[in-house]
């Protein structure tokens, strides 16, 4: 089956449950197979997806990618599974999944290693435009200082006039 998937040339979207368990017929003990490693070893690109229960680490993409590395998948393959392979799987590889001239320019600037639990998003750019800056996030300031922060209205984008100004 892995060979036919490889021949198809498309990434395989994996279940959030990354370990397949089945009883060994001889010992009746569970055998565990780390599914991403099977595909990585065969050269089949794969995509990781978060679990619907993202409150635990194993439901988070960074954790799934880090677990892949821990289980012997190359760091490059693990990162591709949450970036370029995902974009390719939905037919958007020409626009998303990596940074290159002509692509949309979606980028997360992180505080450290993307596979580390302590890493946070510092800045976020969508289509090359700033979309988030942790340094100006009122909620982060409240959490880190313990002091309430004033609520400020977001700046109106000059290219998008206010609906009230249009009389609507």
For the regions a protein language model found, what residue spans apply to each?
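Short active-site-adjacent structural elements
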Residues: 117-118, 134
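Beta-propeller domains
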Residues: 1-4
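Small/polar (Gly/Ser/Thr/Ala-rich) solvent-exposed segments
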Residues: 114
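Extracellular/periplasmic ectodomains of large secreted or surface enzymes and adhesion receptors
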Residues: 123-168
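His/Asp/Glu-enriched, well-ordered alpha-helical/loop segment
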Residues: 6-11, 15-110, 119, 130
């Amino acid at each position: 089956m892995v060979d036919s998937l490889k021949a198809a040339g498309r990434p395989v979207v994996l279940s959030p449950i990354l370990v397949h368990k089945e009883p060994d017929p001889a010992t009746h003990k569970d055998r565990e197979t780390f599914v991403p490693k099977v595909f990585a070893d065969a050269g089949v690109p794969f995509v990781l997806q978060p679990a619907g229960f993202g409150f635990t680490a194993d439901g988070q993409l960074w954790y799934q990618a880090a677990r892949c590395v821990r289980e012997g998948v190359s760091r490059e393959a693990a990162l591709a599974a949450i970036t370029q392979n995902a974009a390719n799987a939905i037919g958007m590889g020409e626009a998303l999944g990596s940074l290159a001239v002509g692509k949309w320019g979606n980028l997360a600037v992180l505080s450290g290693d993307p596979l580390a639990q302590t890493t946070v998003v510092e800045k976020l750019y969508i289509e090359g435009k700033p979309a988030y800056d942790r340094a100006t996030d009122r909620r982060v300031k409240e959490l880190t200082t313990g002091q309430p922060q004033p609520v400020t209205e977001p700046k109106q984008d000059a290219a998008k006039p206010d609906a009230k100004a249009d009389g609507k």
